Regions:
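A structure-centric signal for secondary-structure junctions around beta-strands
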Residues: 6, 25, 69-70
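Canonical Radical SAM [4Fe-4S] cluster-binding loop centered on the CxxxCxxC motif
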Residues: 12-47
Length: 173
């Protein structure tokens, strides 16, 4: 999607439906969420549903959606969409994405091995309006995550090498 130059076509909107995370791998060592929350004395390891949870379906007084049609929605950038703590909210999040086919949702995960158990029943080979990005910060994580990611039923995929801790090859060893 973005790698094909389509990212410039979209207006962008942030949707942090839950906040907080648990450091999962070496790439989490200097997490910006932990760093930012630390400035305000907030515990980033506590995952909470945010007041913005229902944003994609919220409407203005005139009846128009608050997020206009055609936006690229950066989803869950202060957590991991597949984090276990959000299992109880995820079905509702998928439903909002299903309803808002006029938006394109994009999230990044380090927990790609949880995808199959977190997908909605009507997912099939993926929603047309969802891009799932997978972080692979070093060769160890490429070797582990890439085979899972390749086999996952996702229509739009982006590999994220951030933070890029060591040289990585796109081929598992």
């Amino acid at each position: 999607l973005l790698s094909r130059g389509l990212g410039d076509v979209y207006k962008r909107q942030m949707w942090n439906l839950w906040h907080g995370c648990h450091k999962w791998s070496e790439g989490c060592r200097h997490c910006y969420v932990y760093r930012t929350d630390g400035k305000y004395g907030k515990d980033s390891s506590v995952v909470t549903k945010t007041e913005k949870f229902g944003l994609p379906l919220q409407k203005k007084k005139n009846g128009e959606y608050k997020i206009p049609s055609g936006n690229l929605v950066y989803t869950c950038f202060t957590s991991d969409f597949l984090i276990e703590d959000a299992d109880r909210w995820r079905a509702e999040a998928w439903e909002m994405m299903r309803i808002r086919q006029d938006l394109h949702f994009m999230f990044i995960t380090k927990r790609i091995e949880r995808l199959q158990q977190c997908l909605p029943p009507d997912w099939g080979d993926g929603y047309d309006n969802v891009t799932i990005c997978c972080t692979m910060e070093n060769q160890d994580r490429v070797d582990y995550r890439l085979p899972i990611y390749r086999e996952s039923p996702i229509k739009h995929k982006i590999i994220i090498c951030e933070p890029c801790l060591l040289y990585t090859s796109p081929s598992p060893r």
